[in-house]
Amino acid sequence: MAPPTQGGRHRVTLLQVRNVTKRFGGLTAVDNVSFDVFEGTIQALIGPNGAGKSTLFNALTGFDRPDEGSVLFDGIELVGRRPRDTVVAGVARTFQNTQLFEAMTAGENVMVGTQAHQRQGFTAAMLRLPIAVAEDREARDEAGRLLRLIGIEEWIDAPAADLPAGIRRLVEIARALATEPRLLLLDEPAAGLNATETGELVQTLFRVRDTGITVVIVEHDMGLVMDVSDEILVLDRGRKIAEGPPRMIQKDPAVIAAYLGEEAVEDV
């Protein structure tokens, strides 16, 4: 069966998740979840606390191996791959709790992401051989470009330890982009952002998508989710209870009962 179309365009499946299950002892955190992510879209993953969203992210990116199921990224099986191998394949992610190198600047943290595709070896870097010097220069230029894309270039030389919470989260997004992903997974990117910063994040997500990168977000800010998402997947107690465009999700009785609530639907 051909993939559905959107706006008259043929949609290409980039990520295909089938029957993924993850258990921890007697607890089934993710229960037989299947969905597709289409190239060039922004897809949101929502649900109550404990619904299995971050566990599913971990299963997709090699941090937790699912007990059952398949994760195909552009036809490549990701189950069983290490996180670094997943990054090299073209899948990057951020975490719910930011993980920056505190002794480095914002720009240096972003430069770390470029190492996924650098050609230089350890010896070349230690001896400062021409190839290493050139790649360091390219990495700094790329860090500046990505911080401009995110809208925080002025923080490039600021120590990570001194960054406000919202800026730290945006630096982590820039570092993930530095790995040159085709698929970017963001775990609660709006956490710690004020209303102005959240509005800027919305525009950043659109700019990232417009560069050709597909985005999947886990997020509790329903205003942001409804503004940016092409598709929304809803989990509750580890199971998929709904999937579809924002307007459909807002009206789904199961979603309203499990997560959104009547008042939330009226507010978004």
Kindly label every feature range from the protein language model.
Residues 2-268:
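Glycine-rich phosphate-binding loops of nucleotide-dependent enzymes
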